[in-house]
Amino acid sequence: MNKITLKGTLRNIQPSHKINDIEYEKADMIVNRGDGKEDVLNIRFKKFSNVYKEDQEVELVGNVRSYSRPLDNGKNKVDIYVFTYFDIPEEEPEKNNSFEIDGRICKLDEIRTTQNGKHNIHFTLANNLIIENSNQKLNSYLPCIAWGSLAKKISAFKVNDQVKIKGELHSRSYRKMVSEEEYEIKVAHELLVTEIEKVD
């Protein structure tokens, strides 16, 4: 299980990469959270499947994937993105942003408490996605965060537990120091978990 439904605006449509003579494109999708904030999500798709234009509002179904991208310094950066064939949701989405994904907890951090007393926990979910019309399996490692009582519940879980999660895919910006006086603004993506259950 790996399904996400999004409603938002496409921007910055541009070429991404090419595999077996099939061209792929990428874009930013601007998704309104409903509280005045916006998420900027990475979208990828086959070029021929895109019938939309810049700044057009779309509703789509896809799945959340990860890609380990090599950097010039020899390290790797994990990008989180949504791959879609631009399938349209069967019903009008209740939310602009919702996912349902199952998998295995492969990393589980200690629960944390913020300065204002709120609890949160980070974990990584390993998801095995079987590509449609093929026997190919795609492994993704998805960063997750949960807050409050749900964070306390997850803190009792263990690595290798099989779970199913629901929530929203969010973006957040942060500062990365490149020198003592200079910094760069970076964007990270993570799954905000609002529901979780163990599965056999």
Spans of features found by a protein language model:
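Single-stranded nucleic acid-binding surfaces, predominantly the OB-fold ssDNA-binding core
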Residues: M1-D200
